Amino acid sequence: AQIAGYVQSAQRQRGLHALVDVGGGTLDVVTFIVHERDGEDVFPFLVPEIRALGTQMLYQNRLVEAPEHEKSKLPDELQPVLNTLEYAKCTGLPEDHIALRDNVFWSEVHSTVHRVFHHTKRNRYRLSEAWTKGLPVFLTGGGGSVEGYQKSVKSGGLNCAPVMNLMLLPKHPKLADFSGTTSDYQRVSVACGLAQDAFSLGQLIPAGQVENDDNSLHRVADRPDRDELYAR
């Protein structure tokens, strides 16, 4: 639903893409294909993964084994995410402790992204041009503008593709009256996408119905022909 605006925009490209949605509680990562078959948009999903690595988890991680602190000084989780130095000044906690905990957290984000992209490249879409020319990655959600997530997404994918082309989701053409900024739209993109007519989204193919990119596997009955799903 989130990519509804993209597929109806001038930015649209065929082929492999990734979406990384940074919410309050979770980090959602998925690779998918933008394709068209018989005049209908088709979106095969390849590798989805959801981890408890959202912005609230980032803050909770900073308090693990932390020295005594005043809870009243903890920042409001509904406000923009504070970086290491800002968080230290706000809470009075040692900056080196927060930096250490942040390194642990960003390593987990890096590993999650790498795992999804590596599995996609090795088993799901080996011949995609994205592996040589660069992978388009939508980084969205309330935490998408946080530098740590941006760096971790880029580093997590660099062993798979030479460039991670981080992109913002464009507004849906039917939402011309949306008064917020492009950054604001990233926070509400799920709701905006779901508000569209379901038939306008095209055909969504769950990952479980898309065969691995491996000729040694026998075709599973009732699954779409993979040659019809993979953009060439």
Regions inferred by a protein language model and the residue ranges of each:
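Phosphate-binding glycine-rich/basic clefts of nucleotide- and phosphate-handling proteins
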Residues: 31-152, 213-222
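Nucleotide/phosphate-binding catalytic cleft detector across ATP-hydrolyzing
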Residues: 1-18, 192-212, 219-232
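Conserved structured core elements
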Residues: 20-23, 99, 103, 107, ...
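Short, conserved secondary-structure transition motifs
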Residues: 1-7, 54-59, 173-177
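N-terminal phosphate-binding loop and flanking beta/alpha elements of the actin-like ATPase fold
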Residues: 1-15, 146-148, 153-160, 167-168
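Conserved phosphate-binding/catalytic loops in two-lobed NTP-binding clefts
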Residues: 1, 155-190
